[in-house]
Amino acid sequence: MSKSVSRLTNLLLSSNGSDIALLLLRIFVGIMMLTHGVAKIENFSALKANFPDPVGLGAGFSLLLITCAEVGCSLLVIVGLVTRLAVIPLIVGMCVAAFLTFPGFTMAASELALLYLSIYITLLIAGPGEYSLDELLRMTLRRKISN
């Protein structure tokens, strides 16, 4: 048991530990946001009429945009493909949800959106980590260029 704990501790404290943390963060936040997007797809017709339209694009179009971001961008985040670009629509969506959707900003109403926002900003700054399709593509391109 102590060898397993020691190995786990060494792995988490190594440089790979941060890459594993980014992988887990991407997978967990991606799946969680994906559930929001899938729920919007399943109830699109019912939501369309009363969906908040805080920036004046129309309720249906606002719903379509956030649904595409929550599903499409979350899938990209999960696999780590164009991760820094993929989190930008999610950051915008969470800013709109946190600061514009509900009148009179309150922490209670905005807490979940702010939590997602902080995670997406972290991924924007840190990138997807070593265990991502972005890294695989970078390594493949580097090999092709060097040959």
Regions found by a protein language model. Give the residues of each.
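Perimembrane loop-to-helix junctions flanking transmembrane segments
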Residues: L47-G60
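Extended, low-polarity transmembrane helix blocks
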Residues: M1-E42, G60-C68, G72, V79-N147
